[in-house]
Amino acid sequence: MTNIRKTHPLMEIINNAFIDLPAPSNISSWWNFGSLLGICLILQILTGLFLAMHYTSDTTTAFSSVTHICRDVNYGWIIRYMHANGASMFFICLFLHVGRGLYYGSYTFLETWNVGVILLFATMATAFMGYVLPWGQMSFWGATVITNLLSAIPYIGTNLVEWIWGGFSVDKATLTRFFAFHFILPFIITALAMVHLLFLHETGSNNPTGISSDTDKIPFHPYYTIKDILGALLLILALMLLVLFAPDLLGDPDNYTPANPLNTPPHIKPEWYFLFAYAILRSIPNELGGVLALVLSILILVLMPLLHTSKQRSMMFRPISQCMFWILVADLLTLTWIGGQPVEHPYIIIGQLASIMYFLLILVLMPAAGTIENNLLKW
């Protein structure tokens, strides 16, 4: 008798994706982040669902409803903080996952990579709208500032912003629609993640060497299931340490003040995971230029396959490219720091230099390093 997992139409899909899947024998812990992102997504949907049961998307009661969740709902505080800090864990995993893709040349799987970039944009949109929902000061002013950026688009900008707001300012209509979108987007992300996985399984996984591993495959289960479980336990440990010991570490104190359109906070800034892009936006004096740079800072990932000049796929054996990669990482950390600083003397110029360096590294220095390494191979 054939095993049910190989004959049942649904079980067969699960079997081919998570059990009998041929996987390279040498993939490192950097390949754990896909499954960790899946766990983060499930966790966010579940905690979000329970929060939505008690949340009200009305400007007069939104802030109070979040307070009510934390004070009166059974274990509401832990659900709320797991959701808020779960978003941070989600983005940590996302950045590491993308970084892994850049380092090991995984972007040569074009379809998988492009769906991944769409996933990144969708996740960023979801997180932004989620940050507006508690209706604190930073929620309100963050929503006002970021949506207002669209007014920089020539001709249609102002109409577009008012259409998104549902009025002439960020108000009840904005909050209600943001809640609706924040609820639906994670399910769209789940569907996109399945497409991402579908395209990945067409080619099979990359590996640290960047060389085809078709001659040396092992079954996904038990080898990588146990490895993923270890990763998941470490992720949950890190999340719960954050939730139980420092739940407000990554948040903004201003968000504990109810939204007030008449009082602007001294420093408007987004959550930490958007600071690098925010720093790039602020470093350009022209509004439209800043918005374009902001979008391009993420959209540039789509160009990565075109900018690959090396004869080798992975950076494992390319020391010059490795240097460029780690300079890029340091540059992104610098941008993240600058994004959280006020707009004054030393920070402005540091932000501008870091922004120039970001685009210079990706568009010029990394492709140049690949070409130099190709020539070194001839020696």
From Swiss-Prot:
Binding of heme b b562, residues: H83, H182
Compartments where located: Mitochondrion inner membrane
Cofactor(s) the record lists: heme b
Record-annotated membrane-spanning stretches: 33-53, 77-98, 113-133, 178-198, 226-246, 288-308, 320-340, 347-367
A Pfam family of this chain: Cytochrome_B
Ligand binding (a ubiquinone): H201
Subunit and partners: The cytochrome bc1 complex contains 11 subunits: 3 respiratory subunits (MT-CYB, CYC1 and UQCRFS1), 2 core proteins (UQCRC1 and UQCRC2) and 6 low-molecular weight proteins (UQCRH/QCR6, UQCRB/QCR7, UQCRQ/QCR8, UQCR10/QCR9, UQCR11/QCR10 and a cleavage product of UQCRFS1). This cytochrome bc1 complex then forms a dimer.
Annotated function: Component of the ubiquinol-cytochrome c reductase complex (complex III or cytochrome b-c1 complex) that is part of the mitochondrial respiratory chain. The b-c1 complex mediates electron transfer from ubiquinol to cytochrome c. Contributes to the generation of a proton gradient across the mitochondrial membrane that is then used for ATP synthesis.
Name of the protein described by the UniProt record: Cytochrome b
Organism: Connochaetes gnou
Lineage: Eukaryota, Metazoa, Chordata, Craniata, Vertebrata
